[in-house]
Amino acid sequence: TLPIFIFDDENSKEHINGSASKWWLHHSLIALKQSLDNNLSLYRGDPKDILTKLTETYNVKEIFWNRCYEPWRIKRDKKIKSFFEEMKISVNTFNGSLLWEPWNVVKNDGTPYKVFTPYYRKGCLNSEMPRTPIQKPKIDNLLLDKTNSISIDDLELMPENNWYDEMEKLWTPGEKGAHNKVDIFIKEGLANYK
């Protein structure tokens, strides 16, 4: 298994990440890399080009990624998936960031909810339980691309001035911070929601 992250700042066009998003991503990648015993290869550029090079270098037979839901990313990912499937490389995509797929919790007319309470009633109270997270791969089964991978700093995500000092006191990026926020929400927010 070769865990990778690709920072695609080429395809986004007008959807460029702001400074706070980049700060968050920088620290989330640090946390992810640590959780994988530093076995996370990082790249910047066009995902199709990078994945093509990796499939050739490592004789890849299967590619797995978490789905993105912005329209431009859906379009890009469909093209990439088709390209690799034509090359007889299996592509498996997963919901890695939402409780339910957006198209599974909709109003009776098929349109998305715009108000939280009806969404909550249909999604949280009446839908199937979200899938459980898959187990983290064993660290000894992970590869690291030492030739082409770049450092987190090479992604150039951190702003030049340190306006984020106050934010660092309030927010904890990464999986651990997310688990803490979910626990607080379940105990203090969701349990008391009417």
Residue ranges and their predicted role:
Residues 112, 118-194:
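Glycine/tryptophan-enriched, flexible segments
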Residues 1-130:
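Trp/Phe/Arg-rich N-terminal binding region typifying the photolyase-homology
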